[in-house]
């Protein structure tokens, strides 16, 4: 769908990029889509740190920021503009802040422990 304006933003990471994307999307004559990182209580951390967590998502490379503007093609420019740099933070640190990821990691640990327990019990039962 090369005719759709698409941007991925995180207000807590780069407010100017978010505003720029909104202005570009609003001025585009065709369909526009803005995909925004939106912190929420279900992520499992204090909402007072929501903007900082958005920045951590971008800094870790988990949430890359970009703008795809089809108008740039007509101007002889690449339509995709990346608005982020190389990762500056750990993905593990980002995930550790959110209980939604800790729950998944906890499940994996429990599943591994259950596998070990099953193997142990299956080899130590009555002959």
Located regions from the model:
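Cationic, amphipathic, low-complexity alpha-helical segments enriched
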Residues: 103-124
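Short catalytic-loop micro-motif centered on adjacent basic/acidic residues
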Residues: 5-10
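Phosphate/pyrophosphate-binding betaalpha-module
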Residues: 1-2
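Glycine/aspartate-rich loop-and-adjacent alpha/beta segment that forms the canonical ThDP
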Residues: 12, 18-110
């Amino acid at each position: 769908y090369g005719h759709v304006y698409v941007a991925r933003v995180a207000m807590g990471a780069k407010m100017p990029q978010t505003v720029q994307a909104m202005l570009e999307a609003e001025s585009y004559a065709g369909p526009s889509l803005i995909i925004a990182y939106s912190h929420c209580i279900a992520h499992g951390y204090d909402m007072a740190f929501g903007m900082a967590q958005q920045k951590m998502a971008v800094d870790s490379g988990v949430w890359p920021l970009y703008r795809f503007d089809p108008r740039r093609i007509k101007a002889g420019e690449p339509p995709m503009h990346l608005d982020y740099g190389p990762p500056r933070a750990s993905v593990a640190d980002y995930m550790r802040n959110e209980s939604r990821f800790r729950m998944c990691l906890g499940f994996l640990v429990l599943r591994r422990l259950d596998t070990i327990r099953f193997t142990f019990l299956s080899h130590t039962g009555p002959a």
